[in-house]
């Protein structure tokens, strides 16, 4: 358990709290008798924030800056335990740094890119307001000392949207967490409490949310609040919810294991309606496997097995039946959201031959990346590939074989047996014929991606889709107020980040997961604080 930023104005307990709330709140229902009896202390604030990742941190800062007394909790031990200290970058709009350039990405351009790009699946009102809140979120980070590479520097309207909105983090872990701690410490009315997991919302007799029950290793705490913002990071660590919303998919969780869906379920129990769109922010490096150690790769030079890079090179992909299922160019060039087809099966596979392995280990990685792939990855990840040749590729393959997620065989028929890929021989025969003809009539893969698989021995690699977070959850109005099944506001309840029904299927713009989480946190924090005096 860790307690940071304690202010005498925000940290009040015991009988003092009960007396203070007697004149301002209706009677509070005990959400769970056992939890109520176990509560060892009671705290009071204006706004309680559940979760201190990207959205929760911004919500806490924004609410405090609007004059609210804020208590923000997280189940992690510290900021280092939140995924937000390890994310790659944020897609943001009209930050103070962007405005220094003539051709900066405008709010209108961002909206007109995202809304039609998602086929109008987004909540248009909340998308508009998230975009409007983006600059405040970006400036919190910039002014707070977070170091960025500004991918938008010098761009024009002809450049990719990824670069035009790109704020790429140059630090991770403790250096980034130190900045977050300093931001919180600078606000007298903000208390952060780590090692506390929100488990249930408190409601009054009218159904308004007026607090949260939190558990820690030291006991149960009741936080009484005039409003609660839930921003707990989705449900990637909840296998049952993954099966429910992603049709039995097996996902490698690249986050930190605290995102188990509790926040979404708390909101549902309080009467909030869950939305219809569920997606994932996929691993931008193409692949993962639960048998591997580490289980995924998300940037070059991270000590992970480069066999995970193969989908980025456009190699043939098959499902557990040994059959192709997509145009592999999509995986190479739109990695963040082309992971959607992978969710249809727990596993997918790529196959290469010895000739390809020999080529990979003797040529720079850049030779295997198309211009489309490079544009999709962005400058920060590309820098990691500068001058890299996978000279130890065969040793990497042997490691994958030892860990059980790769196999080697002298024939395609024998290779198929390793993972039960029944139709693989016929698939490779048809693929080789397409390579010879220079035309793929099955999934229309461009010829420059195609290379025959003919020279044994042959190799197969098994992958699970990897993801940073799930996307999708509780419906809100245009200002992050949770709504019920009638689209009426659940009083006192706000939702931010990936716990909200803010995204489309599939996830559309790379970097907007972190960027929109940050901005929605600002929006929720501003709204919750302003609603107190409305």
Model-derived features with residue positions:
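C-terminal segment of N-terminal export signals and the immediately downstream linker at the start
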Residues: 5, 26-55, 64-66
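Conserved redox-cofactor binding core of oxidoreductases
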Residues: 132-219, 239-240, 287-288, 295-296, ...
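N-terminal secretory signal peptides and thylakoid transit peptides that target proteins
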Residues: 1-19
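A glycine-rich dinucleotide-binding beta-alpha-beta segment and adjacent secondary-structure elements
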Residues: 200, 422-507
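Glycine-rich loop(s) and the adjacent beta-strand/alpha-helix scaffold that form part
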Residues: 223, 227-293, 514-523, 527
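Core beta-strand elements of the Rossmann-like FAD/NAD(P) dinucleotide-binding domain
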Residues: 43-45, 218-227
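Glycine-rich FAD pyrophosphate-binding loop
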Residues: 65-85
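An anion/pyrophosphate-binding glycine-rich loop and adjacent beta-alpha core
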Residues: 264-266, 273-418
């Amino acid at each position: 358990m860790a307690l940071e930023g304690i202010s005498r104005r925000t940290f009040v307990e015991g009988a003092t709290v009960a007396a203070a709330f007697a004149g301002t709140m209706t009677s509070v229902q005990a959400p769970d008798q056992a939890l109520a009896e176990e509560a060892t202390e009671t705290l009071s604030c204006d706004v309680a924030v559940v979760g201190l990742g990207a959205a929760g941190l911004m919500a806490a800062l924004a609410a405090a800056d609007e004059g609210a007394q804020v208590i923000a909790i997280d189940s992690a031990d510290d900021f280092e335990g939140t995924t937000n200290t390890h994310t790659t970058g944020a897609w943001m709009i009209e930050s103070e740094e962007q405005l220094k350039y003539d051709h900066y990405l405008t709010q209108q351009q961002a909206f007109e890119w995202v809304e039609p790009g998602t086929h109008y699946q987004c909540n248009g009102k909340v998308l508009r307001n998230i975009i409007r809140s983006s600059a405040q979120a970006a400036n919190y980070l910039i002014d707070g000392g977070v170091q960025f590479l500004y991918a938008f520097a010098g761009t024009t309207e002809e450049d990719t949207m990824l670069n035009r909105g790109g704020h790429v983090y140059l630090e991770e872990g403790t250096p980034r967490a130190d900045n977050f701690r300093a931001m919180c410490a600078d606000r007298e009315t903000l208390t952060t409490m780590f090692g506390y997991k929100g488990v249930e919302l408190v409601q009054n007799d009218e159904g308004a949310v007026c607090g949260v029950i939190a558990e820690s290793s030291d006991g149960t705490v009741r936080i009484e609040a005039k409003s609660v913002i839930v921003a707990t990071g989705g449900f990637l660590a909840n296998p049952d919810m993954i099966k429910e919303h992603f049709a039995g998919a097996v996902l490698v969780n690249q986050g930190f294991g605290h995102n188990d869906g509790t926040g979404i379920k708390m909101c549902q129990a309080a009467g909030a309606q869950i939305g219809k769109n569920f997606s994932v922010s996929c691993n931008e490096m193409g692949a993962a496997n639960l048998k591997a150690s580490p289980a995924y790769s998300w940037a070059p030079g991270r000590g992970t097995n480069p066999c995970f890079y193969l989908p980025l090179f456009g190699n043939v992909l098959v499902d557990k039946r040994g059959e192709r299922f997509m145009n592999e160019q999509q995986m190479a060039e739109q990695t963040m959201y082309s992971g959607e087809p992978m969710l249809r099966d727990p596993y997918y596979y790529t196959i290469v031959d010895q000739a390809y392995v020999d080529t990979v280990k003797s040529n720079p990685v850049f030779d295997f990346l198309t211009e489309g792939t490079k544009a999709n990855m962005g400058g920060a990840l590309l820098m990691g590939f500068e001058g890299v040749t996978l000279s130890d590729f065969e040793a990497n393959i042997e490691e994958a074989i030892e860990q059980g997620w790769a196999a080697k065989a002298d024939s395609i028929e024998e290779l198929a047996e390793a993972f039960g890929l029944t139709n693989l021989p016929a698939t490779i025969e048809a693929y080789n014929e397409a390579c010879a003809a220079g035309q793929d009539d099955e999934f229309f893969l461009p010829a420059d991606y195609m290379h025959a698989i003919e020279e044994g021995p042959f190799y197969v690699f098994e992958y699970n889709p990897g993801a940073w977070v799930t996307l999708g959850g509780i419906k809100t109005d245009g200002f992050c107020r949770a709504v019920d099944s009638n689209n009426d506001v659940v009083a006192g309840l706000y939702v931010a980040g990936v716990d909200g029904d803010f995204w489309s299927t599939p996830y559309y713009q790379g970097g907007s997961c972190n960027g929109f989480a940050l901005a929605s946190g600002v929006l929720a924090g501003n709204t919750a604080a302003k609603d107190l005096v409305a």
